[in-house]
């Protein structure tokens, strides 16, 4: 029974060392040992001082203190089933010789009494006292526990690095998805623009053809009318008298002979040329698209075949389920720079993908008037913000001596924090990047310095999981992961410190 060892131990605690019975009216003497009041009182009757029967310390008789806790415990022990206590006592004795167990055999891992120790079964074995053996193993256990503790720390660190590597991998996947979305979006946009231009040009040529038809009909009808008038005048002359017929006859005949049909060109060469150019452009596009389709068809089949052959059974099932559900995971959108949130010393490219720090002396008063919540960095937020889901972007850093900057995320709470007791820097999770390395920074506290030289850093944010992952965008190696929880929307954050340095975003 699980309670038997405890029962035996408790009985030993409430046993009087003098009478070896359960304590009666237990008292504690100055040295701390406990006895029956009657038993200890019988020691040294003729003297005011006695020697403790256990430790031999001299104590005064009049200092005996009743021990109510032991008295209560003794009562409880006495109320227990004696069979349980006796069974425990038997467990501490040799089952074969009924002697008390004092020794431990290393070879057999068995407890021995004196008789067992001297027997032929154990005489040649390494036998030590139980307490000594326990002490030896205690040292081994402590050493092993310490080793396991070190392994625990190592596993935790490797787990942290492994999780970071997985987050960096997921960031790469999301970034590749974003690039594909953007490239195909641009391709579709370019095709739509090309289609629109080709059709618009043909619509215009059609309009010009209709206009040319009207002009051609007008010109030819006008000439026909002139010809018919001339013919009619000659026929009338035939019906007149001889004198009337001969009057101005030469002029009349001359007009008939000189009449020429001015046959205009139905379709001008300029329109013919424009139509030919449209057809040529269309044929060129069709040829390019046909080659692209053929190439994509061949390469696509090879790529799909290689991909499917690389999957095991379980992976194929998950792939089939994904295709069946047609559930494409949501992807993030490209990040641009928000000029409205920018430090006045920052300038931007037209596409809002590049920010450069130009410190102009004449703007000093403006800089002093406008608070710099992320001093000494000149900062700008990115757009759009993120209130759920994931977002990924990469930032290339350039400038004198490699530049110095911060890249990370900031919550919308940072806007009003600078005017209150809380610093705006309490709401950022970022890397301070310098030519010699980088340093994670959050809640106004810098973390350990990392000997990682970055030229291009990737940032992956999972709002739902509270993860901000940084990775080397060139090597794809994980750098650092913040694990937190976001209160509201978060935004990309970029800051520059060195004049003429710049950050370029992608995609």
From Swiss-Prot:
Summary of the knockout phenotype: Mice are viable, normal in size and without gross physiological or behavioral abnormalities. Mice are however more susceptible to infection with RNA virus due to impaired cellular antiviral response. Mice also show increased inflammatory response, characterized by enhanced NLRP3 inflammasome activation. Increased NLRP3 inflammasome activation leads to an aggravation of alum-induced peritonitis. In contrast, it attenuates the severity of dextran sodium sulfate-induced colitis, an inflammatory bowel diseases model in which NLRP3 possesses protective roles.
Subunit record text: May form oligomers. Interacts with isoform p52shc of SHC1.
GO BP: any one term: ubiquitin-dependent protein catabolic process
Keyword Cell division carried by entry: no
Post-translational changes noted in the entry: Auto-ubiquitinated (in vitro).
Inducers of expression: Up-regulated in response to lipopolysaccharid and IL1B treatment.
EC number of this enzyme: 2.3.2.27
Gene symbol of the encoding locus: Trim31
Organism: Mus musculus
Residue ranges that the Swiss-Prot or TrEMBL entry lists as coiled coil: 176-241, 269-298
Tissue specificity remark: Highly expressed in the gastrointestrinal tract, with high expression in the small intestine, moderate in the large intestine and weak in the stomach and esophagus.
Protein name: E3 ubiquitin-protein ligase TRIM31
Domain B30.2/SPRY intervals: 315-507
Family to which this protein belongs: Belongs to the TRIM/RBCC family.
Keyword Acetylation: no
Organism ancestry: Eukaryota, Metazoa, Chordata, Craniata, Vertebrata
Reactions listed under catalytic activity: S-ubiquitinyl-[E2 ubiquitin-conjugating enzyme]-L-cysteine + [acceptor protein]-L-lysine = [E2 ubiquitin-conjugating enzyme]-L-cysteine + N(6)-ubiquitinyl-[acceptor protein]-L-lysine
InterPro entries, per database record: B30.2/SPRY, B30.2/SPRY_sf, Butyrophylin_SPRY, ConA-like_dom_sf, SPRY_dom, TRIM/RBCC, Znf_B-box, Znf_RING
GO-annotated cellular components: mitochondrion
């Amino acid at each position: 029974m699980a309670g038997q060892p405890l029962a035996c131990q408790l009985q030993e605690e409430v046993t009087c060392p003098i009478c070896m019975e359960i304590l009666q009216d237990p008292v504690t003497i100055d040295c701390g040992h406990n006895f029956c009041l009657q038993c200890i009182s019988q020691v040294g009757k003729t003297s005011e001082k006695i020697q403790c029967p256990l430790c031999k310390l001299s104590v005064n008789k009049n200092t005996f203190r009743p021990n109510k806790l032991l008295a209560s415990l003794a009562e409880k022990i006495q109320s227990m089933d004696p069979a349980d206590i006796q069974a425990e006592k038997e467990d501490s004795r040799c089952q074969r010789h009924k002697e008390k167990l004092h020794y431990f055999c290393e070879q057999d891992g068995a407890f021995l009494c004196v008789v067992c120790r001297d027997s032929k079964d154990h005489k040649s074995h390494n036998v030590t006292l139980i307490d000594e053996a326990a002490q030896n193993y205690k040292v081994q256990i402590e050493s092993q526990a310490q080793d396991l503790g070190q392994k625990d720390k190592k596993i935790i660190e490797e787990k942290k690095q492994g999780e970071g590597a997985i987050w960096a991998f997921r960031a790469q996947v999301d970034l590749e998805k974003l690039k594909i979305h953007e490239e195909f979006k641009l391709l579709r946009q370019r095709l739509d623009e090309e289609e629109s231009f080709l059709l618009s040009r043909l619509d215009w040529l059609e309009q010009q053809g209709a206009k040319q038809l009207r002009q051609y009909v007008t010109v030819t009808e006008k000439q026909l009318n002139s010809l018919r008038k001339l013919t009619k005048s000659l026929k009338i002359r035939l019906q007149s008298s001889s004198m009337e017929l001969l009057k101005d006859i030469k002029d009349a005949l001359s007009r008939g002979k000189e009449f020429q049909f001015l046959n205009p060109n139905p379709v001008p060469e300029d329109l013919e040329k424009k139509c030919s150019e449209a057809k040529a452009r269309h044929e060129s596009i069709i040829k390019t698209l046909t080659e692209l389709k053929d190439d994509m068809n061949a390469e696509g089949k090879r790529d799909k075949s290689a991909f499917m052959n690389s999957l095991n059974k379980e992976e194929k099932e998950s792939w089939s389920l994904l295709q069946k559900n047609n559930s494409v995971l949501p992807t993030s959108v490209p990040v641009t720079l928000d000029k409205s949130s920018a430090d006045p010393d920052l300038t931007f490219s037209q596409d809002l993908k590049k920010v450069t720090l130009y410190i102009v002396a004449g703007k000093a008063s403006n800089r002093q008037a406008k608070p710099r919540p992320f001093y000494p960095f000149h900062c700008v937020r990115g757009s759009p913000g993120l209130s759920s889901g994931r977002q990924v972007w990469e930032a290339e850093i350039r400038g004198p001596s490699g530049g110095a900057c911060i890249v990370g995320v900031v919550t919308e709470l940072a806007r009003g924090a600078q005017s209150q007791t809380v610093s705006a820097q309490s709401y950022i999770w970022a890397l301070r990047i310098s030519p010699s390395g980088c340093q994670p920074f959050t809640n106004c506290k810098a973390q350990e310095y990392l000997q990682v030289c970055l030229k291009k850093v990737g940032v992956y944010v999972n709002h739902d999981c509270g993860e901000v992952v940084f990775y080397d965008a060139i090597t794809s190696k994980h750098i650092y992961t913040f694990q937190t929880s976001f209160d509201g929307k978060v935004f990309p954050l970029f800051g520059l410190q060195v004049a003429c340095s710049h950050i370029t975003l992608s995609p």
